[in-house]
Amino acid sequence: MEYISTRGHVKDAGSASRFTDILLAGLMPDGGLAMPMDYPRLAASDLAAMRRMNYRELALSLLSLFADDIPLADLKATIDRTYTADIYGNARADEDPQDITPLRTLEPGLHLLALSNGPTLAFKDIAMQLLGNLFEYVLTRNGQSLNILGATSGDTGSSAEYAMRGKRGIRVFMLSPLGKMSAFQTAQMFSLQDPNIHNLAVRGVFDDCQDIVKAVSNDHAFKAKYRIGTVNSINWARVSAQIVYYFKAYFAATRHDGEAVSFSVPSGNFGNICAGHIARMMGLPIRRLILATNENDVLDEFFRTGVYRPRATAETRQTSSPSMDISKASNFERFVFDLVGRDASKVRELWTSVDRGGAFDLSGTPWFAGIADHGFVSGRSTHADRLATIRRVFERHELMIDTHTADGIKVGLEHREAGVPLICLETALPAKFAETIGEALGRAPLRPPGFENIEDLPQRSVAIEPDVQAVKDFIARHVAA
């Protein structure tokens, strides 16, 4: 499998980018995102064979299509080490951790995909644990080291840090918006004392953090000198790892290949639902991809109107689903690349405007008309909606859900179709957002063992201005130390 950039960069003939090249690189040299030259297409016989596979077997079958420069035995060993019941052991009492991503039926035709049973209780563990093991495998094989620079609005940071702590040859520099995460999320990250983990609390919002990561990644001299890599959802390996659970959920929710299902996905940075889009392009029978936003509704606005208008820092709202408090979706470029027929020059034109603080408008174009062909619909959820949905699910199904999952269920139900199974993606366990759960239900969610008093642990972080040079200086000092 060869990889190209959404903005047109292709390596010289005879040295095309492969999976292990882009694994460590983050952004492509032209500032675009890595994409497969072509999506593998699966035949009916492939789906029939996959239906009988467990999670590890399914992951190997799918990821070997994208990572074919890793020997199959090595890839299998990495996958087998990643997807175990021990690592994903925070399942509810009636879920089997051997399933890795258990599917729960709430009522006939309505399902919840449990993605948050990993070490940090968030869906991002599914891909991040694999990413940590892949990084260590490639770095050890090549005798290299890597300095990971990431940005988080809540869950990516802790997921990345737990996946990378203690890994040979890896340091993590994680940017988060100061005071914008839940107390639980903050404690998960800042309580880590590992010497290879550095938490930088940026005086700004998540988009400031993300912009700094992109700016550093686009400084090719600095990136090369300090071996900068990324774990954010711009990393193709994360997206490809997330494709697996769409297939697993499909097989669990259907009896026969060819049946169509719809997925509802809480969306901030577009990485999770981007994996669903790619699964659909590969031939998985997905009827609708239902994108749910919170009050930061940049993506909902695009899918309704064709206008993509990232908000300024001052316009980004702080909400009770903080991991979606994002106004510039970094993975969205991948979908637009497909939407415009993989015309890299058009993507460059559109993102030149975005990168300068502007917007673009595809309304009235054949591209916008083609969104329906990709199965996308969208909707928006507010704090009041979240509270009502949390209450509804608890009263009807005796199940506590977190705030982001509530956004997904609320919008998913608005687009539910008779006769089409609806699978809502659970993105975190409610223990991470006890304040809002208490507001909705008048009681606190139970915490898995080991998380009972996490907020009381000593915390370590460094407050920093939203300044690219300040972050570069911090990295340089600690890499040289």
Which sequence ranges carry the predicted segments?
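PLP-dependent amino-acid enzyme catalytic core
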Residues: 1-481
